[in-house]
Amino acid sequence: MRDKLLPRQLCAQPCRLAFRWPGDKKASHPLSLKDLSLAGQLERLKEMGVACLKLEGRMKRPEYVAVVTKIYATALKEGREPTGDELAQLEAAFSRQGFTQGYYRDQKGPAMFGTRPEGTKDPEELFAQARA
């Protein structure tokens, strides 16, 4: 795996690969965590003194970054958590069978794992709005 790392030691995402265990007929994704999302914890994070948020967007489309940053920025500016509709937009923009708060809430376990179903298409209508 080390030989395949990109310049500047960027991640080659082995956690997203399928593995087949000896004796198994089908490969699975035993290392693939759902995306961590603390969108519903913005006010709590602010109270804790968090002054900066990191968005994992290195391998995502620019429209994804636009959708996510708009939702977070609007919610923070208005001093509120994202609405249900905004949370649905976040999930539509990109998620692996939903999001997890597992490490933040110390709820580690199988519910933290998920994959993006094969053939999932990008939400072009949502992304078109981001481009407008």
Label each PLM-derived region with a short phrase.
Residues 1-132:
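Surface-exposed amphipathic alpha-helical tracts and adjacent flexible/coil segments at the periphery
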